[in-house]
Swiss-Prot record:
It is a multi-pass membrane protein. Coiled coil: none annotated. Heme b b562 binds at residues 83, 182. The gene is MT-CYB. Its main location: mitochondrion. A ubiquinone binds at residue 201. The cytochrome bc1 complex contains 11 subunits: 3 respiratory subunits (MT-CYB, CYC1 and UQCRFS1), 2 core proteins (UQCRC1 and UQCRC2) and 6 low-molecular weight proteins (UQCRH/QCR6, UQCRB/QCR7, UQCRQ/QCR8, UQCR10/QCR9, UQCR11/QCR10 and a cleavage product of UQCRFS1). This cytochrome bc1 complex then forms a dimer. One of its GO terms (cellular component) is respiratory chain complex III. It comes from Scarturus elater (Small five-toed jerboa). This is Cytochrome b. The chain crosses the membrane at residues 33-53, 77-98, 113-133, 178-198, 226-246, 288-308, 320-340, 347-367. Keywords: Electron transport, Heme, Iron, Membrane, Metal-binding, Mitochondrion, Mitochondrion inner membrane, Respiratory chain, Transmembrane, Transmembrane helix, Transport, Ubiquinone.
Length: 379
């Protein structure tokens, strides 16, 4: 009798995706982050669901409802901090996942890559709206500053901002709609992740050397299910250490002060995972220019497949490109640091140099390095 997992319509899909999936035999731990992102999404949806049972999306009670969750709900503090720090783990995994794709040339799977860029935008939008919900000082002012950027769009800008706010300032209508969007978006992310996997399984996975691996495939289960399980354990360990030992390490102290439209915090800044983009936004002394640079800082990823002109897919045998890649990583870390600093000398100029370098590496230096490496191959 044929195994049910190979015949049953539903089980067959699961089988072909997670059990009998032919997988390259040499993929390293850098390929674990896809499944870790899946785990993060499940954690966020579950903790978020339980938080939504106790949260109220009204400006007068939002802050106290979060306090109530932490003080009065059974294990509410655990659920709240799992959700807040789970977002940080989500972004760490996201950045490493994208970084791996850039290093090993996974962006040549154009459909998979573009869905991935769309996923990145959606997750960033979800995280931004979630940050507004506790209705602390940084929630309110972060929402005000970031939504106000829409006013830089010529002609329709002001109307667009007021339409987003549901009034003439960030208020009750804004909070309610942000809660609604924050609830629905993770399910859209889950649907997009399925499409992401669908396109990936059309081509099969890439591997560290970037060569065709059809001659050497192994079944996903048990080899990579075990490997993923180890990743799950490590992720949960790090998350629990963060939640149980220093839950506020990555948060902002200002968010423990209820939102006050009459009192602006001295330094308005987003969560740490947006600081690199925030630094790029601030490095241009023009509102519209800054907004364009902000969007392009992420959208530039969609251009990467078209800028690839190397004869090799992976960077593993391309030392010049490797140097530029790690320069890009260092540059992003610099931008993250600058995004959290006040707007004064020398941070302004450092941010501007780092922003120029970020775009230069991706748009100019990497394609030039690839051309040089192609020439060196002929020698």
């Amino acid at each position: 009798m044929t195994n049910m997992r190979k015949t049953h319509p539903l089980m067959k899909i699961i089988n072909e995706s997670f059990i009998d999936l032919p997988t390259p035999s040499n993929i390293s731990a850098w390929w674990n982050f896809g499944s870790l992102l899946g785990l993060c999404l499940v954690i966020q949806i579950l903790t978020g669901l339980f938080l939504a049972m106790h949260y109220t999306s009204d400006t007068t009670t939002a802050f106290s409802s979060v306090t109530h969750i932490c003080r009065d709900v059974n294990y509410g503090w655990l659920i709240r901090y799992m959700h807040a720090n789970g977002a940080s783990m989500f972004f760490i995994c996201l950045f490493l996942h994208v970084g791996r794709g850039l290093y090993y040339g996974s962006y040549t799977f154009i459909e998979t890559w573009n869905i991935g860029v769309l996923l990145l935008f959606t997750v960033m939008a979800t995280a931004f709206m979630g940050y507004v919900l506790p209705w602390g000082q940084m929630s309110f002012w972060g929402a005000t500053v970031i939504t106000n950027l829409l006013s830089a769009i010529p002609y329709i800008g002001t109307t667009l901002v007021e339409w987003t706010w549901g009034g003439f300032s960030v208020d009750k209508a804004t909070l309610t709609r942000f809660f609604a969007f924050h609830f629905i978006l993770p399910f859209i992310v889950a649907a997009l992740a399925v499409v992401h996997l669908l396109f990936l399984h059309e081509t099969g996975s890439n591997n560290p050397i970037g060569l065709n691996s059809d001659v050497d495939k192994i079944p996903f289960h048990p080899y990579y299910t075990i490997k993923d399980a180890l990743g799950f354990l490590l992720l949960i360990l790090v998350l629990l250490m963060l939640v149980l030992f220093s839950p506020d390490l990555l948060g902002d102290p200002d968010n423990y002060t209820p939102a006050n439209p009459l009192n602006t915090p001295p330094h308005i800044k987003p969560e740490w995972y947006f600081l690199f983009a925030y630094a790029i936004l601030r490095s241009i002394p023009n509102k519209l220019g800054g907004v364009i640079a902000l969007v392009l800082s992420i959208l530039i990823l969609a251009l990467v497949p078209f800028l690839h002109n190397s004869k090799q897919r992976s960077m593993i045998f391309r030392p010049i490109s490797q140097c530029l890649y790690w320069l890009l990583v260092a540059d992003l870390l610099t931008l993250t640091w600058i995004g959290g600093q006040p707007v004064e000398h020398p941070f302004i100029i450092i941010g501007q140099i780092a922003s120029i370098l970020y775009f230069s590496i991706i748009l100019i230096l990497m394609p030039l390095a690839s051309m040089l490496e192609n020439k060196m191959l002929k020698w």
